[in-house]
Amino acid sequence: MEEKRQNRIGIITMYYNSSNYGGLLQAYALCKYLNDSGYPTKQITYDFYRKTISSSKDYKNLVSFLFKRLQKRTNNLIIKTINIIHGVSELRKDRRNICAEFRASIPHTETVYNDNSIEDCNNLFDIFIAGSDQVWNPDVFRPSFFLSFVNEEKKKISYAASIGNSITGKEMQSEYEDALNKFDRISVREKSDINKLEDLCKKRVEWVVDPVFLLTEKQWETVSSPVQLNINKEYIFCYFLGDDKRHREIAQKVAKMCNCAIVTIPYMQMNYRKCDSKFGDEKLLDLTPAQFLYLVKNAKGIFTDSFHATAFSIIFNKWFITFGRTDHPRMNERITSITSLYNCGDRCVLDYSDDVVQRIFDKCPLTTNCRYESQKALQLIGRSKEFLLSIGK
C-alpha cells in the first residue's frame, strides 16, 4: 500500500528581499513550527515590490497610475539626495545584504515569483497560508496576498494576517469580501480585526498569536547571535520605527537615572532622520535579525514603538515601555492587543502627560523584576497551535 504523502505548505508573506527584523523573525517562526510539526513548509519567494498595472486595479485609470509612479520617483529622488548628504545612501542595500544569510536560513522556494508566474506554485504545494504580518494592509494591497493564484481544489488559509489600517471605499471593501470568501479558514493577529473582517465576509474569523509566540524563549535564545558593543556598562535598547522626538527624550532621561548607556538602531525607515542622528551612545547600522534578538535579550530595558520589539520583550521577560506611533496612530491596535493579552497594558504609553512620564521614571529598569505570565495568553497560544495542526486534516 502506497504511503500517503504529507501535505506540503507554502506560505506567502513579506519575505522576499526583506530587511525587516520582525517580518523575517515571524516568517522564520511559522516555517520552523510547521516543519517541526511534520508539515514540509516553505516561504514562497514572492516579489511583491513589482506591482504591475494588470495586477492592480490601476489599469482602470492609467493616467492616475503613471502620475502616482512619477510622484513617487520624484519623492524618492529628494530622499536619496538627503541620504547622500548625510552618508546613509547605501543603508537600504546594506541592510538587505546583511539580512541575506538569515533569509536564506528560512526554507523557501529557489524560484522568485511575480504576479505573472506565481500560479506555478500550485505544482509545489497542497496547502497555502497567507500571513503573518501586514499582508492584508490596504496600503499594500496585492491579490496574491489573498491567494488569488491558488487553484480551487487547494486549501487556502490565513494565519495571523494583519490589516494595519482601515478598509475604506466600496470598491476596496468589495475586493476584500470576494477574496476572503474564497478562504477555507481565516485567522488574524489583532482581535480588533475580527469584527472588521466578519462584517465584510460570510466567514468565521479566528484570533491567533503572532508566529513568534509559537516558539519558546529557549528556542529564540538559540537563534540569537552576539553583538560586540563598545560600551562598558549596562544598556537600554531603543528601537524606534517612528520619528517622535519625545520618545527619545524620555528614554534618555531614564537611561541617565539608571546610569545606563543607550544602544539604538537608527534610521529604521532606511532614510536619514534628524531625530536619530544625535541619539544614542552606540548606533548600530548593520545588524542581522539574530543580533536584534541578542540586543533585546541582554538589555536592561527596552524603549520601542514596534510590535515585534514589544513581543520579544515579553518573550524574554524584559522591562519595556512601548510608545504609540504618533505618525501612524491606527497601528497602535496591535500594541494594545498584545500588551492587554499579557496583562501588561501599563507598559503601553499612548499619551505624554506629566503623570504618565513620571510613572515611567518610577519604574526604573534596574529595580524591576519582570515576568509576563498570562493564562489567557497560554490558552491562545494553545488554540493557535491547534489551528495550525488541524489544517492538514
Residue ranges and their predicted role:
Residues 1-393:
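Active-site anion-handling motifs in enzyme catalytic cores
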